[in-house]
Design a protein with these regions (language model features):
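Extended, loop-rich substrate-binding clefts of extracytoplasmic carbohydrate-active enzymes
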Residues: 70, 75-129
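Short, Gly/Pro- and small/polar-rich lid/capping loops
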Residues: 1-10
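Short, hydrophobic/aromatic-enriched beta-strand segments in well-ordered soluble domains
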Residues: 16, 105-107, 125, 216, ...
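Short Pro-Gly-centered flexible turn/kink motifs
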Residues: 65-73, 136, 269-287
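Active-site/ligand-binding surface loops and adjacent short beta/alpha elements
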Residues: 74, 146-147, 155-230
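Acidic, contiguous internal or C-terminal segments within carbohydrate-active enzymes
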Residues: 7, 107-148, 152-156
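Acidic-aromatic substrate-binding/catalytic surfaces of carbohydrate-active enzymes
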Residues: 15-71, 77
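Glycine-rich active-site loops that engage anionic ligands at enzyme catalytic sites
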Residues: 218-257
Length: 292
């Protein structure tokens, strides 16, 4: 497998790993991270800065779903009891094209062991000035219509002063099994309709009715990141662990976690053979003095 692919211009530097189709880390050219720093040691996708979610995102309770007259099964793909985050993040991707400003990766799931999906996924990561753009496409290569979902799992640095704005209309509580519970109004403590600090407690929730825009500010490094996501990503997953306050995740998703189990295949995108689902999001980095 090739080594990390480095993307670089006069504003940003980014490393990409074919393993997991993951972004390893990302920083400004003067060394300020806007994605989680990787650190030392061998590559581990769970220590990376971003990985793709395909053909579904998050967990599938019960590891199965019904579609038509068929029952389709998933197999757990980690030590957890449920199939989680799809196949792409655990797979080796092929570098199809590469330059200093972009890389195209592809992954073929022709003989699935853990899921019933047969597909081709393509990820295109590019730099343009102070903007990183990530695009993910999945094409159904199976013999029948199947539910597909896509998303990204980016990890951002978290400092004591980190502030977030990401307006949404509602959220899902969390229940046992790290699964969504009930859809309710967003509590004041997690209302990010205006720029505010992350609460000093654990968050692991899906926010729906998202505008596709978010802003992160790191006062300590005088840096800001503006996120824009395609309309297919109408919700985001926010994960901020209580025991490790060095990072948080804000991941665009095309469907609610556990939607296959709760709402059925129609809650995802039903792709006929040959059909494609695609979506992109971007991160634009800028200097920020507003909290100095």
């Amino acid at each position: 497998m090739p080594a990390f692919v480095r993307l670089e211009n006069d504003r940003l530097s980014l490393r990409v790993s074919p393993r997991g189709g993951a972004v390893v880390d990302g920083s400004t050219r003067d060394g300020r991270p806007f994605l989680r720093s990787f650190g030392d040691g061998g590559f581990d996708v769970l220590r990376s800065a971003c990985f793709p979610l395909v053909p579904v995102g998050n967990r599938v309770e019960g590891n199965g779903f019904e579609l038509g007259d068929g029952h389709y099964r998933f197999m757990p793909n980690t030590a957890e009891p449920y199939y989680i985050h799809g196949d792409g993040w655990l797979a080796d991707w092929t570098v199809k094209e590469s330059s200093a400003l972009g890389v195209k990766l592809a992954f073929e799931q022709a003989l699935p062991e853990k899921s019933p999906h047969v597909y081709r996924a393509v990820q295109i990561i590019t730099l343009d000035g102070a903007t990183v753009r990530l695009e993910l496409k999945v094409t159904n290569r199976g013999r029948g219509t199947m539910p597909f979902g896509i998303g990204f799992h980016p990890y951002f640095p978290r400092t004591d002063g980190t502030r977030l704005m990401a307006s949404a209309e509602g959220w899902w509580t969390e229940r046992d099994g790290l699964l969504p519970g009930l859809r309710t109004p967003i509590p004041e403590s997690a209302d990010f309709s205006t720029l505010r600090e992350l609460p000093r407690r654990r968050l692991n929730n899906c926010f729906e009715g998202w505008s596709g825009r978010a802003r992160i500010v790191w006062p300590e490094t005088r840096l800001a990141a503006d996120i824009e996501a395609d309309p297919v990503f109408s919700r985001y997953m926010l994960y901020a662990p209580e025991d490790d306050r060095g990072f948080f995740c804000l991941g665009p998703m095309s469907h609610t976690p556990n939607a296959l189990a709760v709402s059925g295949p129609d809650a995802l995108h039903l792709l006929a053979p040959g059909d494609t689902l695609s979506g992109a999001f971007s991160i634009t980095v800028s200097d920020c003095e507003e909290f100095q």
